[in-house]
Amino acid sequence: MTNKKKPVIYLIGSLRNEKIPYLANDLRKLGFEVFDDWFSPGPEADEFWRKYEKIRGSTYKQALSNYAGKHIYEFDKFHINRANIGILYMPAGKSGHLELGYMIGQRKKCYVLFDKEPERWDVMYQFADAVCFNFKELKEELSKLKNDTLK
């Protein structure tokens, strides 16, 4: 019996996207380990962090260097680094796009999933291995992967 590790997906998206954990569950059913724990603080986590740091008198630059900013960043980065695959679930903000770009720069398999055609188009999503517009398309792309091709 072989003990192959499951490929790891880092699911990227917005804290405000209530569909994140459901997509994560669907991906788990396909046999992947999916990291979406970043979603657990809730939709206002960034705003609460900002308010807290403002009360302390911190600038944005200082807040990035304080314990909360550093620990949250290191937590996410650790899991991004251990993942083989990145999936950006749209709509997503600046952080999500930075995370996807970082993963693409590491030559990991990366995908963008839209739930509908966007109003504003952008050619740069072509950096991803595929741009999908529904779960079926994403599932087809993921089925093409072989464990030996994942970094």
List the predicted regions and their residue ranges.
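Conserved catalytic or regulatory cores that recognize and/or transform ribose-phosphate-containing ligands
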Residues: 1-151
